[in-house]
Amino acid sequence: MDMFADNVVTLVDEEGREISFEMLDKVNYNGNDYIVLLPLEEIEKEDEEAEVIILRIEDRDGEEVYVGVEDEEELENVFEIFQSRFDDEDFDMYDEEDEE
């Protein structure tokens, strides 16, 4: 777990629980920055069907804030950029929309 220490982001959910994620990438799309996260519990379980979380980075009073993205097209475009960066590597992530 030490090798991920620099890439770990801990967020608090709506119920006040802390959840740790590995930050896989930062993506710029349409002038906005996004982070792509993978829950650490998924890594520890070696879950082959783990889903990434994409959040938009916003600046609020000089502080970086992560905001959920509601627009499906925006999410898909950011995910495609992220996925294209890993095409040549052994990185098997999928978008949940691909299964529907």
From Swiss-Prot:
InterPro entries reported in the protein's UniProt record: UPF0473 (IPR009711)
Name the record gives this protein: UPF0473 protein Csac_1599
Q: Which family does it belong to?
A: Belongs to the UPF0473 family.
Q: Which HAMAP family match?
A: UPF0473
Q: Per the UniProt entry, what species is this protein from, by scientific name?
A: Caldicellulosiruptor saccharolyticus (strain ATCC 43494 / DSM 8903 / Tp8T 6331)
